[in-house]
């Protein structure tokens, strides 16, 4: 996978500046869903969508939120088509950072999500969001 190709984002911004109709999608868990937001408009997904609306007023945007609390990329790869991709998105942000564990199986399912998005016929710009944290252990080995 190429982790540093901005061509799809540049094309998305070009199309938005040209006034095209675009679909902005999100796939993830509870953070994407908007859990614990004080109101729906404060959820990160809606705020990103609203940024597109405010920045490119000449375009019409559709908002697709495929966030379901408590789900990981294992479930996300299975529902990517029905929850987001069937709407032919031009942009998809992905966040499973809280629910995915750092184990090979989850890394494979996360990669499956990314590959599914990148190979979808609408060629969406894909932005991956991750939460980086470190568990502190008092013993020399995390397994002790």
Explain the meaning of each model-derived region:
Residues 1-27, 32-40, 45, 49-59, ...:
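N-terminal secretory targeting modules
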Residues 13, 17, 25-27, 33, ...:
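Oxyanion-hole/transition-state-stabilizing segment in secreted/luminal serine hydrolases
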Residues 64-72:
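Short beta->alpha junction loops
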Residues 110-115:
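Generic structural signal for well-ordered alpha-helices
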Residues 120-126:
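A short helix->loop->beta-strand "cap" motif at the edges of active sites that frequently abuts
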Residues 137-144:
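Conserved small/polar residues in nucleotide/adenosyl-binding loops
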């Amino acid at each position: 996978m190429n982790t540093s190709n901005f061509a799809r984002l540049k094309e998305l911004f070009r199309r938005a500046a040209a006034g095209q109709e675009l679909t902005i999608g999100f796939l993830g868990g509870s953070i994407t869903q908007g859990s614990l937001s004080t109101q729906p408009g404060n959820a990160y997904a809606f705020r990103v969508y609203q940024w597109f609306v405010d920045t490119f007023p000449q375009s019409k945007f559709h908002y697709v939120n495929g966030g379901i609390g408590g789900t990981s990329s294992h479930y996300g790869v299975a529902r990517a088509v029905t929850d987001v991709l069937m709407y032919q998105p031009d942009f998809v942000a992905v966040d499973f950072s809280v629910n995915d564990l750092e184990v090979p199986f989850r890394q494979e399912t996360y990669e499956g999500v990314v590959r599914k998005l990148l190979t979808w016929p609408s060629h969406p710009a894909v932005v991956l969001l991750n939460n980086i944290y470190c568990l502190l252990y008092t013993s020399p080995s995390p397994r002790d």
